[in-house]
Amino acid sequence: MTAEVNLAVELPGLKLKNPVMPASGTFAFGDLPENFNWDEMGAIVLKTATRHARTGNPQPQIDLLADGVMNAVGLTNPGAEVVASEKIPALREKHPDLPILASVGGESVEDYVEVAEILAAAKPDALELNLSCPNVSEGGITFGIVPEMVEKITRLVKEKVDLPVYVKLTPNVTSIVEIAQAAEGGGADGLTLINTLLVLHLDLKTRRPVLGNDFGGLYGQAVKPVAVRMVAQVKQATSLPIIGVGGINSPEDAAEFILAGASAVQIGSMSFYDKLAIKHVIDGLPAVLAGMGTSDVTSLVGQWQSNKQ
């Protein structure tokens, strides 16, 4: 019999019964499996909303690999107004005790602020800034790779909304620590990392990319070592709580992220293969933590030890 293990975690704006939640986009705006008790999750993270509705990128948008998923969906969503007026209220009515993180996207700094204000009016528990969107006014460069832009967007959003703000970091940078510190400087309440790795997969017969948008984002088991490394580095360099994401397929994977420095975790790609992946991680986590000699999940956060010490 597994010893009693406390999985409860408190983060800014979030009281989680356990540290496990879906990554943004996994279950859209609450489209969860019917054979799963939604309230067993620590929280739900919504798909990214933009100022106006988006139909997404050309097909194909998804490429399933042996050890991961490539996607170039293009932030398909009905627009922030619909998410705020319909999606969030409907989810709140069905699951009043389930913490909600609303994901914010944009094509300009002004977009991010406006979308954040629109979503905040629907009273989710927190916002997650998806800074992996392209900055249209600057030739399409990704917002999240420029420290000054990360700091600016975070600061402006924080000035306009009375909600905790978590900044989701792109791994496609030279220094993830520099980006994390920029978010902290802008007043972020927490960090989510990592977003997808920019990749290209070519079809040898057609000599063309497999994805309709050419380049895509890779997530799944293949990116886990990168994500764990970045979580560990950011934990050592900032004081912000971290939500870790990237290739979590099992309770052991979740525990590894927590050991590296994550206070909570998100699961994305595994849910494409197993709709109950989140439930399996939640159910299996107590035994894994007990086996590590831990009776409270919070006591494990960031407790890895370097071989160099």
Outline where the language-model segments fall.
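Hydrophobic faces of well-ordered beta-strands that scaffold small-molecule active sites
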Residues: V20-S24, G42-L46, I100-V104, L127-L129, ...
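Alpha/beta enzyme core
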Residues: E107-I243, E252-A260
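N-terminal capping/small domains of soluble enzymes
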Residues: M1-I100, G106
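Alpha/beta catalytic cores of nucleotide-metabolism and tRNA/nucleoside-modifying enzymes
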Residues: M1-A3, L218-S239, I243, N249-Q309
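Short gly/pro/ser/thr-enriched loop/turn and capping motifs at secondary-structure boundaries
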Residues: R51-T55, P134-V136, L198-H201, F272-D274
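Short amphipathic alpha-helical segments
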Residues: P33-N35, N57, A116, L204-K205, ...
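Structural signal for hydrophobic packing residues in well-ordered secondary-structure cores
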Residues: R92-H95, K123, V161, L285-G293
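Short, surface-exposed connector motifs at secondary-structure boundaries
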Residues: L14-K17, K94-I100, K160-V165, Q236-L240, ...
